Amino acid sequence: MEPRDKLAADLADDLPVAASSLMAMTLAPEGDRMRGDESGTDGPPRMVGQYKLPLRTWSVPVLAILGLAVVIFVLAFWLNVLTGDSDGTTSADNLVHALLYQDVDQARNTLGGLGEVMAAVLGLALTVSSIIVQLAATRFTPHITSLFFRARTNLLVLGFFVTATVFVVWVNFSIGDNYVPRWGVLFSMLLMTASLLLLFPYFAYVFDFLDPEKIVGRITANGLYACTPIRGKAAQAVDERQLQAIEAVEHLTNIGLNALQQKDKNIASSAIEALCKFAVLYGETKAGMLKEWHRIAPWNRRSPDFVSLSHEAVGDLRERCTWLEWKILRQYQMVFTEGLTQIKDVCYLIAIDTRRLGEAAAKRGDLHTLDLSIKFFNTYLRATINANDIRTAYNILHQYRQLGEMVVNEGRSMVRKARSKSEREQREVLERAKTLERRAVDVARFMRYYSSVAFKRGMVFIAEVIAHDIGTLCAVAFHAESRCHDEILRIFLAVDDATESADKEKTLRGVRLAQIKLATDYLVHGSVALAKQVADDMKAEDHKRLRSMWQELDKLDTREFWEVNDRGSNFDYLTPEQKTALAHFFAWFPGLGYEQVEDDPSVVLRP
């Protein structure tokens, strides 16, 4: 588990909110953090969304308006002094006396006007804030209302307006023929002045409070605080903390869904990113949670995300300590399904964040969460194939392959770092690395399965994309000297089995091109036996077809693809070294020498 102070220090980089609101978004109480006292986790998981504007936002308009009013008042008084009578009635002493010693009629006139102004200020503040909050709640999530009226600053300002109004009413009511509340009149004047001065900063606070990114950040921080390991009696309130975390996840999802319906891509992206940050930060600290935290309570079991699961599936989530990750990924699945018909860019972002969630789990050794990420990637692929959405499937495969690459590299990194350790520790690390790298094999195996599904549904391009992605993953495993390479290669060479045409004689051209590309990579790095293994798999191919593919690969000189896409490069691009190895590879096919390659006008070359 990461130290609490490190989490607090890194929070600014992990939560998608403005810097002004990050001050309140920590995983420990404010006072304890200032003292550096580790006992701060003994307290209850209180809400940390006490949003505050910078002091300058309040002080600058207040001082500016007050200063201007004072200058005008002093100027008017000075002009009165200059143009007043010579009897000396216009003086500072007389001004002070007039303010402090009013008679009954003067006090009643003053308080009558003050009462009306104070009521107007209070009504204006309540009306404006209520309308704005209601509009924001309709646009984002109803939870905004509770956040707003729970904010300390909002309660203080509205409470001040109400108190000032009540005070003015009481002072006005207390005036009688024999009693003049001179100081009450003066305080009423001061309270009205303060209320008017606070009005504009308060409106600025309300608008800033309802900024979408800050709302998302505040909800995220509140949910994260409920997931933070604590000690003492507060740690036993597991149900309350689970409810707080679940509500945060669901509120973020509602924001994303509402934004999708309104075609607001930026807000939807912020909510999706926040869910990813939530899952990653929670994963870093969940090892310190009580065992009771990982159970699924009956009230939680009845929620839509768990109610349809079998008892065995719920038991697996409990034993693997992944119920909250399941909850978050289920929200991703729901937003993904909505995004397929609304804003497809959101689907790409969900794939990216699912990859990030899986990568974070792999780095900390949480294989169960990594398996969940892989499972949901498969679910995304199934949804896109069922919807015949080629472009979305293309982009999801890109992220899926990158997750597999990261798993391979992380496994090799673990082995390298263990070289300086004892023999026993090295064996343990090797076993963990082997278990981790098995997930890369799973990724390749699942990809091959979905290539068959896509091919049967007529999505030929997706089948070819999967072949290139598995080939790239195989190359990464080869360069990393991973023990899972041979198994990934076996899966890669079996991709063509699922993409043969109906007469079982013709394999997809893109699959063969991907295999040739991998073989040239082997040859460039001296692995002739592996390249020969690829050639043996292609020995039944028609020579004319092989010659056409040789020509296509040899004449493709541009790495960058000519259209805008996430990958940005041509699948079939070969480096100059790989092109040199083409002759070596095709020499294994009798009768197919380099001198026999001729220009074939039927081949469509890429730029």
Residue ranges and their predicted role:
Residues 72-86, 101-175, 195-207:
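Transmembrane alpha-helix detector for multi-pass membrane proteins
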Residues 117, 154, 191-195, 346, ...:
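Secondary-structure capping and boundary motifs in well-ordered enzyme cores
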Residues 131-143, 147, 178-198, 255-281:
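Hydrophobic alpha-helical transmembrane segments and immediately flanking/interface helices
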Residues 147, 151, 172-245:
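Canonical alpha-helical transmembrane segment with a positive-inside/aromatic-interface signature
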Residues 207-596:
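Soluble C-terminal extramembrane regulatory/interaction domains of multi-pass membrane proteins
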Residues 595-607:
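Eukaryotic, compositionally biased intrinsically disordered regions
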